[in-house]
């Protein structure tokens, strides 16, 4: 039986698209702002 190779790494996901990373840059802040405006339940990962 072969292993499932795609698991998704939570640490990497946070480092790439977490809230704190988004707040670092101007465009990231824009992402947060637009998601808040749209009423997303999850603003960042």
Curated annotation (Swiss-Prot):
Molecular function terms from GO: structural constituent of ribosome
An annotated GO cellular component: ribosome
Ribonucleoprotein as UniProt keyword: yes
GO biological process: translation
Keyword terms of this UniProt record: Ribonucleoprotein, Ribosomal protein
Gene3D superfamilies: 1.10.287.3980
Biased segments, Basic residues type: 10-45
The UniProt record lists the keyword Zinc: no
Pfam families the record matches: Ribosomal_L34
Source organism superkingdom: Bacteria
Family: Belongs to the bacterial ribosomal protein bL34 family.
Protein name listed in UniProt: Large ribosomal subunit protein bL34
UniProt gene name: rpmH
């Amino acid at each position: 039986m072969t292993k499932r190779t795609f698991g998704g790494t939570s640490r990497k996901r946070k480092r790439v698209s977490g809230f704190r990373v988004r707040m670092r840059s101007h465009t990231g802040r824009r992402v947060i702002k637009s998601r808040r405006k749209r009423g997303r339940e999850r603003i960042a990962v």
